[in-house]
């Protein structure tokens, strides 16, 4: 039987219930607990920012990060970005400067690393970003592939 990622802390990731895309490398898309929505009223909150909003992760309680890139494959040089957002209003609490992604446009990925930083892969760059959305370091990936 396949083990459930939600029942243990994922090695290498920040101690969070959703530190990486799909909840873990095996993409089980499940977490402990429930929505407790039976007696609640559904509320839908959305934003429109003309960006390719790819995914959100949780780092710590109520610390939600949204990552993405620009949707254009032609025109201005593309860039990636990471935002720390408020869970209820979706207000931007912090945002990285434009993060280079090279000529290879790919939606990318984000993960909360066990050291507390957010790792963002975008195009052919990998960035380490603080919880305040400050770029700490980056690596240029030599192969322009996803």
Positions of predicted regions on the chain:
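Residue-level detector of Asp-centered blade-edge/turn motifs that repeat once per structural unit
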Residues: 59-61, 112-115
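Blade-loop segments of beta-propeller domains
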Residues: 52-54, 80-81, 91-114
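Conserved small/polar residues in nucleotide/adenosyl-binding loops
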Residues: 139-145
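Conserved beta-propeller blade signature
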Residues: 64-65, 117-119
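Short loop/turn segments that connect beta-strands within beta-propeller blades
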Residues: 86-89, 130-133
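A short beta-strand motif characteristic of beta-propeller blades
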Residues: 41-47, 91-100, 135-138
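Beta-strand-rich domains and repeat architectures in extracellular enzymes and scaffolds
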Residues: 8-32, 36, 40-78
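A short loop-to-beta-strand structural motif that recurs across blades of beta-propeller domains
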Residues: 80-83, 125-127
